[in-house]
């Protein structure tokens, strides 16, 4: 029975539209934890995460691959309110950061 439930979940996930959120954030310990925790508390799964330091390590660029669901707009508004989030940009699912990484999977 569990096997069928797993297959159904994968099918639902596969049918969902994906998108990429590009965040510019302050670079210090705990920032990624705060952002991931916000998604987790709202039962929102992050399908992919890439984070690299920029501007001499003072800030970081973070890309989050997520399912485009109705509640995403509300989650984005809450992410924007975090003090360490300096900017956020939405991209469609074909963003090169994740399409390039798919070659390694």
Give residue ranges: language-model regions.
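A conserved regulatory-domain signal marking ACT and ACT-like small-molecule sensing domains
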Residues: 1-105
């Amino acid at each position: 029975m569990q096997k069928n439930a797993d297959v159904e979940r994968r099918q639902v996930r596969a049918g969902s539209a994906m998108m990429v959120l590009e965040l510019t954030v302050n670079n210090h310990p705990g920032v990624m934890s705060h952002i991931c925790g916000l998604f987790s508390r709202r039962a929102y799964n992050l399908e992919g995460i890439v984070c690299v330091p920029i501007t001499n390590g003072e800030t970081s660029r973070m890309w989050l691959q997520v399912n485009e669901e109705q509640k995403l707009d509300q989650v984005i508004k809450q992410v924007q309110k975090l003090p360490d989030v300096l900017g956020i940009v939405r991209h469609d699912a074909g963003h090169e950061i994740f399409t390039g990484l798919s070659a390694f999977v």
